[in-house]
Swiss-Prot record:
One of its GO terms (biological process) is proton motive force-driven ATP synthesis. Keywords: ATP synthesis, CF(0), Hydrogen ion transport, Ion transport, Membrane, Mitochondrion, Transmembrane, Transmembrane helix, Transport. It is found in: Mitochondrion membrane. This is ATP synthase F(0) complex subunit 8. Pfam families: ATP-synt_8. GO terms for molecular function: proton transmembrane transporter activity. It comes from Guira guira (Guira cuckoo). It is a single-pass membrane protein. Belongs to the ATPase protein 8 family. Its main location: mitochondrion.
Length: 55
């Protein structure tokens, strides 16, 4: 069964991961986000309790 022979497939997988980690990932991480995250205010609004008709 040729699928069980790891010789060509392991090298292909290793090459793919190294390409992703060393070339593609730094390029993707260098982009500036268009909507940078902002801290939300610590003001917490309390919602009123719901009055259930059967209680």
């Amino acid at each position: 069964m040729p699928q069980l022979n790891p010789n060509p497939w392991f090298f292909t997988m290793l090459t793919t991961w190294l390409t992703f980690l060393l070339l593609i990932q730094p390029k993707l991480l260098s982009f500036i986000m268009t909507n940078p995250p902002i801290n939300k205010s610590s003001k917490h609004t309390k919602t009123p309790s719901w009055t259930w008709p059967w209680t």
